Amino acid sequence: MACGFRRSIACQLSRVLALPPESLIKSISAVPVSKKEEVADFQLSVDSLLEDNNHKSQVDTQDQARRLAEKLKCDTVVTAISAGPRTLNFKINRELLTKAVLQQVTEDGCKYGLKSELFSDLPKKRIVVEFSSPNIAKKFHVGHLRSTIIGNFIANLKEALGHQVTRINYIGDWGMQFGLLGTGFQLFGYEEKLQTNPLQHLFDVYVQVNKEATDDKNVTKLAHEFFHRLEMGDTQALSLWQRFRDLSIEEYTQIYKRLGIYFDEYSGESFYREKSQDVLKLLDSKGLLQKTAEGNVVVDLSGTGDLSSVCTVMRSDGTSLYATRDLAAAIHRMDKYNFDTMIYVADKGQRRHFQQVFQMLKIMGYDWAERCQHVPFGIVKGMKTRRGGVTFLEDVLNEVQSRMLQNMASIKTTKQLENPQETAERVGLAAVIIQDFRGTLLSDYQFSWDRVFQSRGDTGVFLQYTHARLCSLEETFGCGYLNDSNVACLQEPQSVSILQHLLRFDEVLYLSSQDLQPKHIVSYLLTLSHLAAVAHKTLQVKDSPPDVAGARLHLFKAVRSVLANGMKLLGITPVCRM
């Protein structure tokens, strides 16, 4: 695979540069394929070898590359070495390239790219990923979709790299909003509606009580009293709250099943309502609590003692806040999991909140606060269903399935499917995930129903179509051809481009593992699918000599395998027919 070639190049370079091969391997990268011209297979940035390259001109660097190229010799692995602008370029023996790459893809299967030497010094860690985190008693809003699919991707990637991952869904099941909801249900709730469509009814009640609270201060007072009763453990208030919670989780579980997502632990803010009192006691024992003129209890984070930056940890009526419960949750998780890293996947509007939580953990003496990380993301604009209004995830999933079924029905090449609804949902979800993951996570983006379902271009539908097409090719010709294959005959430009691209998969995985951005994998898979589409037209399997047909089938099988691996990391279930 790529690293076998990298090591061979690194060993040659080490003899000339008097550096250990290990220090050079990560500086040698596979060259991205080009539509315009044939490219080398690997390149070394000469800048990476120069300690003081800030003072080196382009001419100096180019001269260094040329002199270095002259000292290196071709061998059985490398057939050509050339100096480019600021780079050294290496071309691999074509027959060796073909055999090695296809053999590695076949042998490694779902681990292809993950066994690379790029990850050889990666310590295995215990990692907690908190994601999704919807608020109970509300229908699953589409705003939680990003946290859900991003968190799932991060957990998938970390797990694939051999880390021990715990997926936590930290449900918003406590707080002042439940004072409002409890009061609202007592004023406007109907038992019959709660039984037939629980979360829609609770949402309607919540909207109504919020409107009333704006005009009637007595409603706000009742809400504060209800939440205070919850915090004090009032049986009647807790019973109603527990019912809302159970109904919510029941519905959320169905949504996660449709998304193909699971959690190791369902936790909630309510679990930490008592533990948050321990946090307050610890903060008090360290002399960190101060009371404001309004009676709220705060921690001064300014560092200057002027209260220019504070975090409120308790209201004037003695009830806890989100930040206090988050502190309790972090401390409990460290006790329970002894994590090396804890990742919170939440929108960028929460950035200040997490900065304050991490800062308070440090002030409290928890050095492991450095291991906590917030992965922020932007908002989705324009994701509304045909009905308009507030967009619930269930409505989006239903619309995804409906639109995809219509698209599939209008395409003549659509196969007869055993379960068209399931296929439509999987393809539709791929479309939504790819549109979401194409850019940087921190960026807001404009959702487009029309763009998301295009079968051509850079879409999730195109990825699924490519995978299904390659499955059909294998199904049509079976394994017989593979036995007769002589992969060394794969020397056409289309074959070489695919092989060169397959070389890069480990680098792409490495990039995503460093910055936790799925866009690298998305871009890679889209390019792979475009290369496969071109090759499918030009590299015929049917009517070719058996050894050529077998070799091409072997190539397409490798593409399908890597495509499926990448899609699964992104949280997409590949379809075999569509």
UniProtKB/Swiss-Prot annotation:
PROSITE patterns per UniProt: AA_TRNA_LIGASE_I
GO molecular function annotation: arginine-tRNA ligase activity; ATP binding
GO BP of this protein: arginyl-tRNA aminoacylation
EC number: 6.1.1.19
Catalysed reaction equations from the record: tRNA(Arg) + L-arginine + ATP = L-arginyl-tRNA(Arg) + AMP + diphosphate
Alphabetically ordered keywords of this record: Acetylation, Aminoacyl-tRNA synthetase, ATP-binding, Ligase, Membrane, Mitochondrion, Nucleotide-binding, Protein biosynthesis, Transit peptide
Xref: InterPro entries: aa-tRNA-synth_I_CS, Arg-tRNA-ligase, Arg-tRNA-synth_N_sf, ArgRS_core, DALR_anticod-bd, Rossmann-like_a/b/a_fold, tRNAsynth_Ia_anticodon-bd
GO CC annotation: mitochondrial membrane; mitochondrion
Record's subcellular location: Mitochondrion membrane
Residues with the N6-acetyllysine modification: K568
Transit peptide (residue range): 1-16
Family of the protein in this entry: Belongs to the class-I aminoacyl-tRNA synthetase family.
Role played: Catalyzes the attachment of arginine to tRNA(Arg) in a two-step reaction: arginine is first activated by ATP to form Arg-AMP and then transferred to the acceptor end of tRNA(Arg).
Descriptive protein name: Probable arginine--tRNA ligase, mitochondrial
Native organism: Mus musculus (Mouse)
